[in-house]
Amino acid sequence: MKHILPLLVMMTCVTLPTPDSRASDPKAANEQNLRVMIQGSSGAAMRELVQSSGGTITHDLHIINAVGALLSQAQLDEVLTSPLVIRHIDDLSIGPVPPTDPDLADKSCDVGGALELSFSKAGINWTLYNKFDAPAVLQQLALSWPEQLGTIASMSLDGAPVDPGMLTDTGAGSLNVEFGGLARPTLEGKGDLALRFKPAPGAPDSISLRQRDFSAKADFAGDCTVKLIPGYDANHEDFYYAGVSGADALHLHGVTGKGVTVAVLDSGLWDHDLLTRDTAGDNRVLARYDAIDNRVVEQLFDASGHGTHMTSVLAHSGATTRAGIPTGSFKGIAPDVNLVAVKAFNVEGQGGFLDIVRGIQWVVDHRETYNIRVLNLSFGARPRWPYWLDPIDQAVMRAWASGITVVAAAGNDGPEPMTIGSPGNVPYIITVGAITDSWTPQDRDDDYIPDFSSRGPTPEAHIKPDLVAPGGHITGLTRPGATLTEEHPEYLLSTGEFVMTGSSQATALVSGIVALLLQLEPDLSPDDVKCKLISSAEPAINADGLLAYSPFEQGQGLVTATRAVTLGNKGCGNAGLNITRDIAGTEHFQGPATIDDGGGVSLPGLNNMVSAQPSEQGLSTRRKWGVKAHIERLTHSLDPNQPSAGSPFNWEQAYIEEKAAIEALSRP
């Protein structure tokens, strides 16, 4: 069944690097060339070897002591005779085929429904999109609406009236009809499902309506179902995730990321004032670098739209309003950050790993020039090598070691274990999974980790993700006409924003929180930033005191900006690891996870920590997020010396310590 919202556009390393003309050999060009990466004692030494063989340098990658090159087989053989070469990768011309959407496999139907319903006392219009060439045939329709609106007087699909005889069984507030034979309505392309009501006797003249008062489910031939989502009220005024994550409270105190630069390595940036300018209207894009063409540019065209959406989540400078009145908060998490936009992904959202490494290298090389403190990596691919051998992971580790806090997506390949992507598998960085708020931002009891969010451990047994953050149906700006909007027109709001779901969005949100922390404490190291986030995250806890999700699903729990500021610790980030030795190759690190012969994953004592019953997808009467919510729902008296029976965790003691810390902060 087609997901209600699109998942993260996973950016796998599939495009090929384009050679430059700085060193070329006409004879070699006539042979079948290989696109390779040569790694060795230094980038300069590798360049000299390639050039002396007559090959073409495509990428200077000194950050990992490597070059990308275009070589014939004979030239490659010559280069590899040198003892200076440590490693080469010669299959860059054979990229993996982009995965097909499993929801569309062997299907003859693909219909999407607009996120917004047009409704009034007179009737409703719901726009549907048939993305296949053949007409989509409606088989069954289930609707509900406020009873005060009366009964269905008429219905049409794509302008064609539905036989009134099919509507005879409708009652006040509901309709469930099966269409058969020639009476089945059809949809070609874009069309509206339109209903008109016959008012009930004595119905009030004025009725207050919200989208969540309606429900709709349409089943089309070919195993194709589309449902109306509840939606957010006044979504154009409030994107809600700044409030859910606690960023709005910091905005009210002037904490907006001012003075901190975040680099977003993605598909580019649409030059929209609410993205390129801060809350004061000042330009805040310090540089735009195209890692595909290896040049600094004035405009970084975003054909895909993904990079613009990530930047919007992170830095949208538009004010949050209520009934048109500014609240003092903003739609983006860090609306005053400075930005560096780096493009390494194409119109399809695909990127070659040499371009990605070059993009990371440019960020590290210009860290001091632009005060780059955060690097957002909302992409991933299945790991091909251990983290210390993966070229992207190697560059990411060097970025972290240089003082840049790197935040990466866990991926959208869940719910199976060991689905964390690269570079999210790097143990040092902050890896983010996703939760959804089920369209109820004020109610945390229905917040859950959706199946798509990738799970750990990593192949090297490290616990990932590190934490989870809001990533469901995230509103933001993207370029009109971008690939995303063309492929998913149903996720465009009438006010121009675009709604996406995935760990990409959760990652951009966390990058924004990191910028808020660094504005308050600019001397924080990346390790201490990570410590503040994971030590203050709120785990999902069941009523029996056991974890609702394993650490491979939720990491340390749900991140909150206010808790990171008030309760976050230092000194716990990457304890037991040594990035200097890791980069030097003198020591590499395995995590604590165990993996049995059947592929089962665990941790020492995990069975005693996590509930055996799967956590509900939606409203839960058992699950609470955070120690405070868990303890305050209990009926027994609070005694830190007698923790919850059957639980290895002393949540009572943790509650007392958190409360004391908050009270200490409130004292003058």
PLM features per residue range, with description:
Residues F119-P135:
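Short beta-strand elements of extracellular/lumenal beta-sandwich folds
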Residues R22-N30, Q51, Q75, P99-T100, ...:
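N-terminal domain-start motif of subtilase-like serine proteases
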Residues F239, T321-R322, Y370-G476, S535-A537:
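Catalytic-core segments of hydrolase enzymes
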Residues A44-D101, K217-A242, A247-L252, R277, ...:
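Autoinhibitory propeptides
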Residues D266, R284-V285, G424-A515, Q519, ...:
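Extracellular S/T/G-rich loop segment that most often corresponds to the catalytic His/Ser-adjacent loop
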Residues P26, T58-H59, D101, F239, ...:
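C-terminal subdomain of the subtilisin-like protease fold in secreted/lumenal serine endopeptidases
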Residues T311-V313, V340-N346, L375, T419-S422, ...:
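Hydrolase catalytic cores
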Residues A249-A287, V296-L354, E368-V374, A401, ...:
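Subtilisin-like serine protease catalytic core
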